[in-house]
């Protein structure tokens, strides 16, 4: 690992590589902890290292989804368009708590504030709906990748945004049709989109979007989608 060149990575991103993430098995049972760096190295992923994560899809009251473009100084998938916020609960008592996925929802509140500058009082853990879980794996490049048991969370609220440039290059709100257009542009090689945004859009959002007033029928708390 010592010979990996990270000169291009933002200093704050380097510091976050030492955060302790929650290591799980394929059924989301906690089996330990490891650094963010180790969890995202392909050499460890190929040996089966798997960690807990989350993806947030945030809609405003006009039913437009917040899409962010990842900073060019992110370690994985730099410059890619992605979901509203994706990150990890940390290996600490508050974010390990599993009842009603409260630990993950606390982590999501923390990262929505850190990445997008959304004040904590604007989105509480109670505003964050735990929808389902998916298990995914993706390579960013020959060194770095993702292998996650990912909690899919939904928020529908108007918020104030002040993105951290070390995390987020740009933000935009898209209608359902505009999101499909973005995915079509990615298929033509015109833009870069994270694999998990495509997964979320194609596997889940097409069903949820017409029913944002009440997504309760689509909640799947005990299912892990293998994608």
UniProtKB/Swiss-Prot annotation:
What pathway or pathways are given for this protein in its record? Isoprenoid biosynthesis; dimethylallyl diphosphate biosynthesis; dimethylallyl diphosphate from isopentenyl diphosphate: step 1/1
* Residues binding substrate, per UniProt: 36, 70, 74, 87
In terms of CDD domains, this protein maps to:
NUDIX_IPP_Isomerase (cd02885)
As recorded in UniProt, its EC number(s) are 5.3.3.2
Q: Which family does it belong to?
A: Belongs to the IPP isomerase type 1 family.
> What NCBIfam families does the annotation carry?
IPP_isom_1
- Official protein name in the record: Isopentenyl-diphosphate delta-isomerase 2
Q: Which gene encodes it?
A: IDI2
């Amino acid at each position: 690992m010592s010979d990996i060149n990270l000169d291009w990575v933002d200093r704050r991103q380097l510091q976050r590589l030492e955060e302790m993430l929650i290591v799980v098995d394929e059924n989301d049972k906690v089996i330990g902890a490891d650094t963010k760096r180790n969890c995202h190295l392909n050499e460890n992923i190929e040996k089966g290292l798997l960690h807990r994560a989350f993806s947030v899809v945030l809609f405003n009251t006009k039913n437009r989804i917040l899409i962010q473009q990842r900073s060019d100084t992110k370690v994985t998938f730099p410059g890619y368009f992605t979901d509203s916020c994706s990150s990890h609960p940390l290996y600490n008592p508050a974010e390990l708590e599993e009842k009603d996925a409260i630990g993950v929802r606390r982590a999501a509140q923390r990262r929505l504030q850190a990445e997008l500058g959304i004040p904590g009082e604007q989105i509480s853990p109670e505003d964050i709906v735990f929808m389902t879980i998916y298990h995914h794996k993706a390579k960013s490049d020959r060194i770095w990748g993702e292998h996650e048991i990912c909690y899919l969370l939904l928020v529908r609220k108007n918020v104030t945004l002040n993105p951290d440039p070390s995390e987020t290059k740009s933000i935009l709100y898209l209608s359902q049709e505009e999101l499909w257009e973005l995915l079509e542009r990615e298929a033509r090689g015109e833009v870069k989109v994270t694999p998990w945004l495509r997964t979320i859009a194609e596997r889940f959002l097409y069903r949820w979007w017409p029913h944002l007033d009440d997504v309760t029928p689509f909640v799947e708390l005990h299912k892990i989608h293998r994608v």
